[in-house]
Each structure stands twice: as structure tokens, then as C-alpha cells.
């Protein structure tokens, strides 16, 4: 055999072996992917995301479909329209979507008159160079890009809840150090509560008569859906949607649209979703912490527990949870102050499975 023929044969053999290796790698990938992980037992939302990604949709597209299904179903009254009235009785929407490949993010906050939060966030990602739009500006953008609106986001249930709250002297609420303390506003600062007294004998400072209120957080007034999807190619995306805290002060933005707090994703590492007391959690960016801890070698469970413990050390009355998934599809959750459940579907499961995490 001529030298040139030998070279051609060897080159062909090497090419065949490389293609075989790629095919084997893709086969292995398809065995463990896709994966859908979501906070809480939002089964229909996970099924919607699974149908999309199992039929070839990208991770971003599947996240949008899953969170959108939860919005349409008004999951627990805390996602989508018709729930969580603020002090004025109005429902507003927070949402976020993040692509772990490009690190692009689209988000909307305190969005009025448009019910499709996750689709609005996706439009921000696709058709603007911004990361976050808020308030009526977010609404106008979403409507201009084709989403239905403006519309009233209240429901008979949310109106009734708000009316009952008003009859109960607007209690409980998220105000502090104001007068009146036990009735509806208008509110003014309680300056006497902000006086600082210095104890000369101990050199310590004490706040005079500052009112303490336990956190107004529970599974039915802070239920964010936060979802992570790994598609058939191993790419990851995350998304969140919520109508926020019930009886919040108008204009309040929770952690739902804050990247790194409610959700975070990086194709090189994995993703995270969070739920709970967003006003506290956004101060710690727990999902960014989870992903970075996994980058440093922590397993999902260890990373999730570490992120939650960082918050609990500073705020022992905090209530919240995170769910972590690494780039291989391994998942775990951690929580504090409540029992947490999260949902998963992958190729090894016939249907969605719910995992329970104890505090």
C-alpha cells in the first residue's frame, strides 16, 4: 500500500473514531437530560416545561412555558394575576428569565396591567439591551411587544382578601416605626421610636421603643415559582414569576426579578431557584452564592445549605428556601423556618416527583 493510501486510511479511521466519540457523548447526554426543577409542588408547571424541552425546545423556551403555565393556573394565588393584593388592593407582577449560556437576563418588576410576567421578562431579554424594566414602563413595553393589556389583574378573591384586611384595620402590614401603628394610614414616621439612648455605664446604644414585627412570610404569601431547566444539549436556564407579598407597600419590588437572588444560572456550573422572604433574601443573593459555591466544588446539597445558613446567621427569624441543580442534573434543596418542597422531572421519571426538605 502506498504511503499516501496509508495516510488517507489513518485519517479516515481517526475521523470515524472522533465522530463515534461525539455520538457516544451525545447518547450519554440524552440519557440524563433534559431536567426540570421547580420550587414547590407546582406539578402542571413542571409538566409544561417538560413537554416543551422534551420536544426539543431550548432551556429558555421551556422555562418560559413552565412559568407561564403557573401564571395561567395562578399557582397558590401567589403567581400570576388575581392574587397578593398590595395596600391599595392592586396585584402587580415580578418575573425574571436568565440564559446560562449567554448570561443574558430579562426581568420585569412591579408590572401593572399585564398578566404574562415571564413572557414580558423574555421580551425584555429578546428586544432590549436592558436587564430590568419596572412599573408602568414595563407594562407599556410588554404591550408594545404584543402581550395583551392593559387589564385589571385583580380577582374576586384578591378583592375580598383586601376588603377583609381593610376591615381588620390594615393588619398585618409591612410598615414599621410609623403612626398609626395599629390602623390604616395615612402613615407618618414615629420619630419617638427612632430615638437612640446611650447607656453611659455600658457604652451601649439602645433603640427606644422600636416596634418589632415577626416576618409576614408563609407558603401562601411568598410562593415564588423559581424553575431551572437543562435541555437536551446540556444548556441551562432559570426563571421566576410571582405577584409578590400580600399587603405589600405599593411599589415594593421583591427578589423575584433580582438576578442572583431568586434565580441564577451558569452553563459551566448549574443553576438555582429561591423562594421565601425576598426582602431579606435579596440582601444575600443566595442563588448567586449557590452557583459560585458549586463552582468551587461543593455538591448541590452542601451549596444550598451554605447559602441558607449565611442568611439565617444574620436573620434568625428569616423564612426561605433554595433549590440547586448542577450541570449534570444532580439536585438538592435547603430551607429555614419552614418545610420546603420542590419538584423534579428527568428521563428516569415517568412523571414529576416531589421532594420534601426539612428545616
From Swiss-Prot:
Please report the PTM annotation for this entry.
Answer: Cleaved into an alpha and beta chain by autocatalysis; this activates the enzyme. The N-terminal residue of the beta subunit is responsible for the nucleophile hydrolase activity.
What Enzyme Commission number(s) appear in the record? 3.4.19.5
Q: Which reaction does it catalyse?
A: Cleavage of a beta-linked Asp residue from the N-terminus of a polypeptide
Query: Hey, where's the site called Cleavage on this chain?
Result: 223-224
What GO molecular function terms would the record report? Answer: beta-aspartyl-peptidase activity; hydrolase activity, acting on carbon-nitrogen (but not peptide) bonds, in linear amides
* Chain residues that bind substrate: 252-255, 275-278
Look up the domain of life of the source. Eukaryota
Per the Swiss-Prot or TrEMBL record, the active site comprises 224
**CDD domains linked to this entry:** Glycosylasparaginase
Which GO terms fall under biological process for this protein?
A: proteolysis
Q: How does it assemble?
A: Heterotetramer of two alpha and two beta chains arranged as a dimer of alpha/beta heterodimers.
Entry function = Acts in asparagine catabolism but also in the final steps of protein degradation via hydrolysis of a range of isoaspartyl dipeptides.
> Entry's PANTHER family?
L-ASPARAGINASE, N(4)-(BETA-N-ACETYLGLUCOSAMINYL)-L-ASPARAGINASE
Q: What is this protein called?
A: Probable isoaspartyl peptidase/L-asparaginase 3
Amino acid at each position: 500500500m502506498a504511503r499516501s493510501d496509508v495516510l488517507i486510511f489513518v485519517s479516515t479511521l481517526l475521523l470515524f473514531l472522533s465522530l463515534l466519540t461525539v455520538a457516544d457523548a451525545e447518547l450519554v447526554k440524552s440519557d440524563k437530560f433534559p431536567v426540570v426543577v421547580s420550587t414547590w409542588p407546582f406539578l402542571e408547571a413542571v409538566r409544561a416545561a417538560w413537554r416543551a424541552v422534551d420536544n426539543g425546545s431550548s432551556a429558555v423556551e421551556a422555562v418560559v412555558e413552565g412559568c407561564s403555565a403557573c401564571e395561567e393556573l395562578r399557582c397558590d394565588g401567589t403567581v400570576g394575576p388575581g392574587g397578593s393584593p398590595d395596600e391599595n388592593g392592586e396585584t402587580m407582577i415580578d418575573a425574571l428569565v436568565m440564559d446560562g449560556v449567554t448570561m443574558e437576563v430579562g426581568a420585569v418588576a412591579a408590572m401593572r396591567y399585564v398578566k404574562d410576567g415571564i413572557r414580558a421578562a423574555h421580551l425584555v431579554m429578546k428586544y432590549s439591551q436592558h436587564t430590568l424594566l419596572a412599573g408602568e414602563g414595563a407594562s407599556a413595553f410588554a404591550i408594545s411587544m404584543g402581550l395583551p393589556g392593559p387589564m385589571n389583574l385583580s380577582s374576586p378573591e384578591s378583592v375580598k382578601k383586601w376588603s377583609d384586611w381593610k376591615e381588620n384595620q390594615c393588619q398585618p402590614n409591612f410598615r414599621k416605626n410609623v403612626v398609626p401603628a395599629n390602623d390604616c394610614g395615612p402613615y407618618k414616621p414615629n420619630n419617638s421610636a427612632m430615638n437612640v439612648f446611650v447607656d453611659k455605664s455600658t457604652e451601649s446604644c439602645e433603640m427606644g421603643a422600636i416596634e418589632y414585627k415577626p416576618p409576614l412570610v408563609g407558603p401562601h404569601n411568598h410562593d415564588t415559582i423559581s424553575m431551572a431547566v437543562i435541555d437536551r444539549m446540556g444548556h441551562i436556564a432559570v426563571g421566576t414569576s410571582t405577584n409578590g407579598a400580600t399587603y405589600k407597600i405599593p411599589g415594593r419590588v421583591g427578589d423575584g426579578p433580582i438576578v442572583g437572588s431568586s434565580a441564577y444560572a451558569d452553563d459551566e456550573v448549574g443553576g438555582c431557584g429561591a423562594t421565601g422572604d425576598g426582602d431579606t433574601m435579596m440582601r444575600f443573593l443566595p442563588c448567586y452564592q449557590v452557583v459560585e459555591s458549586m463552582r468551587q466544588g461543593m455538591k448541590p446539597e452542601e451549596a444550598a445549605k451554605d447559602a441558607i445558613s449565611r442568611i439565617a446567621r444574620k436573620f434568625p427569624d428569616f423564612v426561605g428556601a433554595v433549590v440547586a441543580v448542577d450541570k449534570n442534573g444532580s439536585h438538592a434543596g435547603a430551607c429555614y423556618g419552614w418545610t420546603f418542597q420542590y419538584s423534579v422531572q428527568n428521563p428516569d421519571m415517568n412523571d414529576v416527583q416531589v421532594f420534601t426538605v426539612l428545616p
